Amino acid sequence: MASLSVPCVKICALNRRVGSLPGISTQRWQPQPNGISFPSDVSQNHSAFWRLRATTNEVVSNSTPMTNGGYMNGKAKTNVPEPAELSEFMAKVSGLLKLVDSKDIVELELKQLDCEIVIRKKEALQQAVPPAPVYHSMPPVMADFSMPPAQPVALPPSPTPTSTPATAKPTSAPSSSHPPLKSPMAGTFYRSPGPGEPPFVKVGDKVQKGQIVCIIEAMKLMNEIEAEKSGTIMELLAEDGKPVSVDTPLFVIAP
């Protein structure tokens, strides 16, 4: 039988070096009885050998492959736009804003990736709505203002001239040669101080200068008319409750 000898020192050194390498696992091999006999010097001195197994680049069934971007955990990564894409998108948006301002565009919608922009222009709608009620309100206002002027024009002027000539007609001309007492103002002639009361003077009464002989109402004021001289009432020329004008003869007083 040939004998086999292996220096144990080299094997131990190899064990220390190999065991310290990353990714390499060491496993001690134990001989099992298989019916093969070795010389006594071999079986006693070399009963164990080291088996090396490298695990580098081995793929296990439950391991995750590594990609350039990192390990994939089974979930989809979120797509984040790059700065260049954002700048290009904003350039398009600014161009669209200029387009909306220069054209009659009411609404514009832009979608790109996960971004959505809606541009609405309300100036056109606001200018179109208000004119409608304005036109409906104008015609009735013009019609209302045109109607009233025709009514007040005809009524007031007619009664005033008819009443003034009536004042001069009832006044009778004095038959006496003495100058009459004339009215100093226009108004309504009253012989008594109030309704149902006796008159101030009658025909044939003697009066004194400064004595009240009648009342003339002008502008809602009662004006007392006094005798200009002392004498006797000869004639009564004005009618009670009738209007008189300036210088209308009222009485004839004879001294």
From Swiss-Prot:
Where the record annotates domain Biotinyl-binding, the positions are 178-254
Residues annotated with N6-biotinyllysine modification: 220
**Which terms in the Gene Ontology molecular function aspect does this entry carry?**
acetyl-CoA carboxylase activity
Q: Which SUPFAM superfamilies match?
A: Single hybrid motif
Q: Which Pfam families match?
A: Biotin_lipoyl
For bias kind Low complexity, which ranges apply?
163-180
Q: Which UniProt keywords apply?
A: Biotin, Chloroplast, Fatty acid biosynthesis, Fatty acid metabolism, Lipid biosynthesis, Lipid metabolism, Plastid, Transit peptide
Q: Which GO terms describe its biological process?
A: fatty acid biosynthetic process
**UniProt transit peptide range:** 1-87
Q: Does the keyword Plastid apply?
A: yes
Q: Where is this region: Disordered?
A: 148-193
Instruction: Tell me the route in metabolism or biology where this protein functions.
Output: Lipid metabolism; fatty acid biosynthesis
Q: Where in the cell is it found?
A: Plastid, Chloroplast
**Where does this protein have compositionally biased stretches of type Pro residues?**
149-162
Which tissues does it occur in? Answer: Primarily expressed in 7 to 10 days after flowering seeds at levels approximately 2-fold less abundant than BCCP1.
* Known function: This protein is a component of the acetyl coenzyme A carboxylase complex; first, biotin carboxylase catalyzes the carboxylation of the carrier protein and then the transcarboxylase transfers the carboxyl group to form malonyl-CoA.
* Record protein name field: Biotin carboxyl carrier protein of acetyl-CoA carboxylase 2, chloroplastic
UniProt organism field:
Arabidopsis thaliana (Mouse-ear cress)
Gene name in the database record:
BCCP2
